Amino acid sequence: MNKKNTTFLNSLYMDFLTENELDLFLKSLDEIWTAELYTNLKQNGLIRHVISKVWNKGQHRITQDFEYESQDSFKKCESILK
């Protein structure tokens, strides 16, 4: 297995008004983040994408962390995700 080093990291916080909205978003992830999309992103330098739910009382938040091979890889993937 060829392990790539992360040289560029992008973190995104997403806040929702209610727990139901957050749950609906989480359920829709398979429709948004398809295998084809991940293949395309990986070919352009995405190393890893992690989605985490934040369990703070009174907050409805997720975080998404994107790890890239380089800043250039980030820019390529950003154009794919627009």
Task: Annotate each PLM feature.
Residues 1-81:
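Short S/T/G/P-rich N-terminal loop/turn motif that feeds into the first structured element of a domain
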